[in-house]
C-alpha cells in the first residue's frame, strides 16, 4: 500500500487542476472559488499563493514561459513573476454565469478547456494563433481531458452525466470525430 503524505494545508474552497511545471520542478494548482493559484516547491516546501481577480478553472504551460489559463472571463495568459493576466478571448461572453472548468494542453501546444455553468456547455480548443474552436456541445460538466499515449484518441469526462467519452483525435489538425461513450457509470453505485 502507498504511503500518502499531506504536503500542505492550502485550505482550498475548490482545489483543482494540479499541474507539474517541469521547468521549475514545482507544483501549481488552482482554487477556483477562492480565486487563487498555488505554487509549491516539494523539495524546499516553499509555498506561494497568488490572488487572482477571477475564477481560474485550469492552467497550462506555455513554451515561451508563463501559463495559459481558462477562467470565468475566457482564455488568458498569466505571468507568475508579476501576477499579470492578459486576456485573449471569451467564447462564452454571452453567458454571464458560465466559467471554464477543466482542461489540458495537447502534445503540439493547443489548449483545450470545457465550459461550465450554463444549461448546455462546450469543449473548446485555443490554437497557437489564438483562434478558438468549439468542438463539442451539449455537455454538463466537461472534466478530465486527456489523450491516449499514441495520440489517436481524446478522452474526457462529463461528470454530471457519469460518462467518459472517447473521440478519434487527429494530432496534426487537432480535430476530433466519432464520439463514443467509453464508460457509462450512471447506473453504478
Go through each PLM region and give its residues.
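Surface-exposed loop/turn elements that mediate protein-protein interactions on large endomembrane-trafficking
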Residues: 39-40, 77-86
Amino acid at each position: 500500500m502507498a504511503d500518502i503524505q499531506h504536503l500542505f494545508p492550502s485550505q482550498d474552497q475548490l482545489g483543482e487542476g494540479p499541474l507539474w511545471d517541469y521547468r521549475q520542478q514545482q507544483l501549481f494548482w488552482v482554487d477556483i472559488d477562492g480565486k487563487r493559484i498555488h505554487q509549491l516547491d516539494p523539495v524546499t516546501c516553499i509555498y506561494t499563493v497568488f490572488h487572482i481577480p477571477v475564477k481560474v478553472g485550469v492552467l497550462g504551460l506555455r513554451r515561451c514561459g508563463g501559463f495559459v489559463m481558462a477562467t470565468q472571463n475566457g482564455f488568458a495568459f498569466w505571468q507568475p513573476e508579476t501576477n499579470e493576466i492578459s486576456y485573449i478571448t471569451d467564447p462564452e461572453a454571452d453567458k454571464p454565469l458560465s466559467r471554464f472548468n477543466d482542461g489540458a494542453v495537447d502534445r503540439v501546444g493547443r489548449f483545450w478547456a470545457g465550459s461550465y455553468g450554463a444549461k448546455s456547455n462546450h469543449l473548446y480548443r485555443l490554437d497557437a494563433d489564438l483562434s478558438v474552436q468549439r468542438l463539442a456541445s451539449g455537455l454538463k460538466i466537461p472534466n478530465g481531458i486527456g489523450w491516449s499515449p499514441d495520440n489517436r484518441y481524446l478522452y474526457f469526462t462529463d461528470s454530471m452525466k457519469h460518462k467518459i467519452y472517447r473521440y478519434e483525435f487527429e494530432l496534426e489538425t487537432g480535430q476530433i470525430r466519432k464520439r463514443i461513450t467509453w464508460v457509462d457509470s450512471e447506473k453504478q453505485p
